Amino acid sequence: MDPRTLMTRPTVAVLYKYVPQYRRRFFELLSDRLTERDVELILVYGDPGPEDVGKGDAVELPWATKVPNVTITVAGRTLYWQRALKVLHGADLVIVEQASKLLINYALLALQTAGRTRLALWGHGVNLKQEEASRLGEALKRAVSRRAAWWFAYTDATAALVRGFGYPAERITVVQNAIDTRELTVERERLTTTETGREEVAALRRRLGLFGHNVGLFVGAMYEQKRLPFLLEACVRIRELVPDFEMVFVGGGPDKPLVERAAAAHPWIHAVGPVFDEARVPYFLLADLVLMPGLVGLGILDCFALEVPMVTTAVHYHSPEIAYLDDGVNGMMLSAACSPAQFAEAAAALLHDAERADRLRAGCRQARSRYTVEEMVERFADGVTKALDVQGLAQ
């Protein structure tokens, strides 16, 4: 008898600090896909820490296992110990977030050295916010990265960084990080094709007091790396170049007072506050462009889903998903050195060029079909299968 017929199906554990809303659908689909491949998924997670709790985006997954997260502050930095070793015992592959502050990663690496499990990393490769990065933390991250049994890289750019550590390319899976935007596209369809939907959008326009037909939109958290002072200065210049230009800000955060003061001074600037999920869709339908001169992350996928091109700059601290923006095809990427006036001139030129704007919207539609959570799940499941194959465990 083949000894493998006596084996139980292989088990893969994913250890996550906490589960944000945008990851729920991914984990649900991944569990289903791995079950189809005769692989058991164990998801282990905790509560958000002090730097995340204010986001209000944590969700509970009844089918997963929740463990306590213990936080320790050392030299002003928050470190985490996740009480998960007992739950992870016996897993053939443990996938963790690549973060030097997650202390359990070092314990799991020791268990891998002892032949007790295999450790895979999932992440960015480096801390893209270099001004916040710890030199020791980044050195530890590189050392651990080279010793992982497998790597799940967010994007092609992440994979290139990991290869730069000396990690073998054949053990890297590019997962093409994405979120589920189906609800956004369904809501867009409803709002644009039904009489009641169109009236809802018109009512929002009246409620905001939008009189112009050239509208910019900012959606997201408001903090330093979003460059709101830069954007507000640029908006004033756009208004000079495009007299009916209006700007809508959706979101909250420590820099929200900057936007509120600008809105008080300029009636064509509208400060809305936080709006989530499909409730954001009508704001996109009122907009011609998303203006985001600072950090861009998964929000680029909202622009693709809702067919509103983004204008941004090539700052060095973008999240990996900025790789999905193809300058001149599905959005616009300006120099990191551009001034607010130059940013404004580029945005105004696009508002005046309907043909070019239509091409960018078509590019958004194409990108929408490429960067999907379903594709991410398939790539991730392929990586899991390959990692288990290395151990001779995939069935």
Over which residues does each language-model region extend?
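Acidic donor-binding loop of glycosyltransferase active sites
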Residues: 285-298, 308-309
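Nucleotide-activated donor-binding/catalytic signature segment of Leloir-type glycosyltransferases, i.e.
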Residues: 9, 69, 257-278
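A conserved mid-protein helix/loop that constitutes part of the nucleotide-sugar donor-binding site
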Residues: 24-28, 214-237, 247, 254-257, ...
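Donor nucleotide-sugar binding/catalytic pocket of nucleotide-sugar-dependent glycosyltransferases
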Residues: 142-203, 210-211
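A short, well-ordered alpha-helix in the C-terminal region of glycosyltransferases
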Residues: 239, 342, 349, 356-370
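Conserved donor-binding/catalytic core segment of Leloir-type glycosyltransferases
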Residues: 13, 192, 198-199, 203-226, ...
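A short, histidine- and acid-enriched strand-loop-helix "catalytic/donor-clamping" loop
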Residues: 103, 117-135, 147-150
